[in-house]
Amino acid sequence: MACNGLCKTREIIMKKIYLNILALLLISGCSENIEVEYDVEFPQKKTYEWRLVTAWPKNYPGLGMAPERIANLVEEMSDGQMKITVYGAGEQVPAFGVFDAVSSGSHQMGHSGGYFWKGKAPAAQFFTGVPFGLTADEINAWTNRGGGLELWREVYAPFNIYPIPAGNTGTQMFGWFNKEINSLDDIKGLKMRIPGIGGEVLKRAGGIPVTLPGGELFTALQTGVIDATEWVGPYNDLTFGFQQAAKYYYYPGWHEPGSMLELLINQDEWNALPKNLKVIIETAAKAVNQDILDEYTARNNKALRELVDVHGVELRKLPDDVIAEFKVIATDILEENAAKDETVNKVYQSYKKFKEEVSAYHKVSEDAFVEARND
């Protein structure tokens, strides 16, 4: 049993009693040959060994390192009271089995992206990101200061899961293509790996969205199972070698403007933890949430230069009319989904309101500054 405030108080009282006895004996002149036995047993803190399953390949840069860093920080800050063993996708459960594993309690923790679970909890997509939505800084602000976190935990509560923000990729690229996209006609019949609402947008535009875990993407693209794939951005895309399987690299990543990653914890296991470990886990996740964003911001620049300058990748911008049509479709889908589901609507209204408010300020601050800087 973990040492609580009561047992600590008892320790202090026992120490004082022994010291008072010793002082009285010394004062009374009975100090010679006095042996005072101080034989108090201090309760040992209960230790915890948890398993964490992820939707990413083991030790994969950025995505896969986020849970590893959380595990290391928790063990260090708890002085070994908690040890978390991290398993990559497929080692114990499939990439898309993480949510169920944590929900059922077969594993205490998981690390993934909320949009993978749209079939279970449609509102979960907002906590990764939605097309033309919040950037990394904005979704962090909405989650931590705008009521998003409370909504997130409300959405996951029926599944016995306690979510914590745990990483962000920043704005992504649209993806890798084996044919040029010059108009909306080029989207028709296009088989592309793209999850979440982005996949729904592609489908309405005439494309064929495909769901595949990261570890299968290179082979699927190289063999023609799919015509295109989105993944993350230059840093991660370079490590998968997509430049060897596709010629064109399209931007902007309208579908994932600031993708937040999630640490999932079984609610029963979380409730049973002592307060100190809860604080340690929350603190570690918050530190890694920013650390991963910093890593992507720093590494994407170098990786993009290498893709273009060394590997000869053709960097292409999506035509304006294609982007405009995607935006119209995305807005329609968000509104329709909100109209069909009370929980989705509740989250959507909060997300939408925050985006409108933060966008108004960013137009005259960050957006205006970046435009001036790049002129």
Predicted features, each with a name:
Residues 1-13:
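Short, Lys/Arg-enriched N-terminal segments with co-localized hydrophobic residues
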Residues 5, 151-156:
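Short, solvent-exposed secondary-structure boundary motifs
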Residues 15-23:
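Sec-dependent signal peptide recognition
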Residues 30-139, 156-157, 162-375:
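N-terminal secretory/targeting leader peptides
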Residues 137-153:
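A gly/proline- and charged-residue-enriched helix-loop-helix capping module
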